[in-house]
């Protein structure tokens, strides 16, 4: 019945508002007009919140009934899910472990290529996710191993996504190596 669809639609929208609103408001209040020294940890957490919010917006767009009919079985769903994880949870985790690794070492100076590694992480992650979002917006199904001729845009997007995912994973490995190196110095 249409009434239940409307109730479900409103519940989907309203359920996301408290969590997203409180989180985003808290982060901006913590940053706004403060003389915070921007460290790698702070940057990773701040961008991680942005990734989490963008993934949430993708979920809300997909939760709209008129969009869900079109988007749900497309690459849009893995796009917003991977946005939560790749640009949210992973950045939070790297930020925490980086912070943890400098708590027990005297050298708090960042590694030589930290800015480059951060740029690789962000560019690789954004490019990887953009390939998913573009595929979803183009109605490319998410469950094909080979794409039919009418969905031929899926194959080039998959290649582009794989290239950016490789850049992203290399950056994660560099961060992991540097964090591990710091932690092993403590032992």
Task: Please provide the spans of the model-predicted regions.
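Alpha-helical transmembrane segments in multi-pass integral membrane proteins
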Residues: 29-38, 64-65, 69, 74
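Hydrophobic cores of alpha-helical transmembrane segments in multi-pass integral membrane proteins
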Residues: 9-30, 43-65, 79-105, 112-147, ...
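Short, exposed beta-strand "edge-strand" segments with a Pro/Gly-rich flavor and a Y/T-containing core
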Residues: 36, 106-107
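Non-cytosolic membrane-interface motifs at loop->transmembrane helix junctions
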Residues: 2-13, 39, 71-79
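Juxtamembrane membrane-water interface segments that cap and precede transmembrane helices
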Residues: 70-75, 149-153
């Amino acid at each position: 019945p249409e009434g239940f669809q409307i109730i479900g639609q409103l519940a989907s929208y309203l359920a996301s508002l408290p969590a997203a609103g409180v989180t985003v408001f808290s982060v901006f209040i913590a940053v706004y007009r403060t003389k915070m020294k921007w460290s790698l940890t702070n940057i990773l957490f701040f961008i991680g919140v942005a990734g989490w919010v963008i993934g949430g917006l993708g979920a809300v767009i997909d939760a709209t009934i008129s969009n869900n009919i079109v988007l749900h079985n497309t690459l849009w769903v893995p796009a917003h899910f991977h946005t939560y994880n790749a640009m949210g949870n992973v950045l939070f985790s790297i930020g925490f472990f980086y912070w943890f690794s400098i708590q027990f070492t005297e050298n708090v100076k960042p590694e030589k290529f930290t800015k480059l590694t951060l740029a690789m992480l962000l560019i690789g992650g954004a490019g990887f996710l953009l390939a998913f979002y573009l595929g979803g917006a183009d109605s490319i199904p998410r469950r094909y191993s080979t794409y039919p001729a009418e969905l031929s845009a899926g194959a080039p997007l998959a290649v582009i996504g794989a290239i950016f995912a490789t850049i992203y994973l290399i950056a994660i490995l560099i961060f992991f190596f540097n964090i591990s190196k710091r932690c092993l110095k403590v032992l």
